[in-house]
Structure formats: C-alpha cells, structure tokens
C-alpha cells in the first residue's frame, strides 16, 4: 500500500489519531511494537492559527516515528489552509483531515462529522488544502450522517477528485457515534 510516495507494505498497521492518547511516547512505543504508520492527536485548525501552545505541542514529531501523519479539523476553508501550511512546516509525512469526529464540541460546530451535513464545504476545504501543501493529504470520514444518509460511495469519489492520496472510512454514521456494529461492507 502506498500513500503518496510512502510505501507502507502490503498489510500495514496504523495507529489511529486519538485525543489525549497518541502523544509522542505512545507513538514511539507503538512503532516499537509494529505500527507501520502513526498519527498525532487531532489538532484544531482554529487553535493552531491562534498559536495556542498546547495545540502547537501536538506538532512535535521525531524521525523515529516516521512515517507520521498530523490530523487537523475545522470548518473554515481559509483557516484550514493556514493550519495546513503550519502543519507542513512541522514536516509530517502526511496531512490528514478529520471529517469523522462525531462529538458535539466538534461536529456540533460544523467541523469533523458535522461536515457530512455540508458536503460542498467539505469538498471546498479538501480541494483548498490539497492545493495548499506539497505533502500527501488524506481524509478520515464516516459512512454518512445517519442511516438514511449513507453517502460514502459518492463522497469517496468526490474526495478522490479533489486529489486526496487516501481515504479512511469509519464504519459508522455520525448518529451512531461509537456505538453499535461497524459496517465493513462498503
């Protein structure tokens, strides 16, 4: 499997981005025990462009972690582009956009999985971020907003047309949050 120029082998093991979990020490431990690629905690684009020190610390990566991705989330195109450029300066191997977080403080404000209710804006942000940076851009999202709006097949094609290097699909809708059985049939 390749993402951009990064060859991850035939069946790579990924350490997903997890808030308050995937700090540098945890990422290094997971690399030691076989993770082929690791992600930082997700980073708020708004906090990043305001230079919030706790957020900036999430950009600290080391060569021992490589390949490593930094994941950002937000709802404003200009803010996401500015944040993407800041992230690129931290020299990750991949920039990942989170359109999958279902929690109210993110999705309720229109970011993360909240973007599943505004697909044109999601695509606008994705295109703008892809065009703004030189590193591969990937996206993480869900099957759709709810059981009546599972749009992932069409959405995947649209995101591919925006130029993303890879797509991670959470096998649940936003309405499911992290409960119920994941749908792996897509």
Where are the regions a protein language model picked out?
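Flavin-dependent oxidoreductase catalytic cores
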Residues: 1-186
